[in-house]
Amino acid sequence: FEDIVITAHRALLRAGENVLAIHGLNRAPGDDDFLITAELTGEGILDLAPRYFQSPTPGEANEADGFAGFVADTSFSVDRGFYSEPFEVEIRSETEGAVIRYTFDGSEPGPAAGSIYDGPLLIQGTTTLRAMAFLEGMVPTNIDTHTYIFPDDIVVQDAAATIARGFPRNWGGTSADYGMDPDVIGQGGRDRFGGRYAETIRDDLLAIPTISVVMNIDEMFGSRGIYTNSGSRGRAWERRSSIEL
């Protein structure tokens, strides 16, 4: 049997009676075997409510499951930026009944990943807050990312603490270089400049543009990471990330 899709010719159908004509041929003039039968299979729209589908199927039946709509995007009560005092952040979605999940470690929240939001979140230091909202039967939101930077944390960060949080010791064949340079802003004026820049470093950080890049550590600094292989080019080296200015 052979299935022939005639959807492309549906415009030829007319209201009322239509005739299906079939031309059948034997395989050879002397072939006594001949069988031909036709069956028409059509699908109608039973549910007139509009639905949204993840994959397009032009000219063919839609997927079995669809979405009734989109979950309203998440909003944060405090915007990303520089801060010096602790504060609380509220996350909302205008979609009634939506569940919000969030993370503090830079990982992506998902239907089964991250913590369920149930009230204001306390931010006491440099934090990357990511959130996503879900509701069954609807398209979830994208991931929103807000990075809150406390300069007091930045000026004292060092290599040991960074490595302890899971960052690699080496970038390929090069030793990793994390943290602030103690030769420039050593504590108590113990640096090459007698504390000159240590006194102004907090204001200096606020005076220049800052970019926050949030992504998987291995995809940034691992053996196939884009920082480790900074000379590589092309789509094969693109990585999923969130960037904030």
Task: Give the residues covered by each predicted segment.
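Aromatic sugar-binding surface patches on proteins
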Residues: 1-5, 115-117
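Beta-strand-rich interaction surfaces with strong enrichment in secreted/lumenal proteins
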Residues: 7-11, 118-120
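Short, compositionally stereotyped local motifs that mark structural "simplifiers"
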Residues: 33-37, 42-245
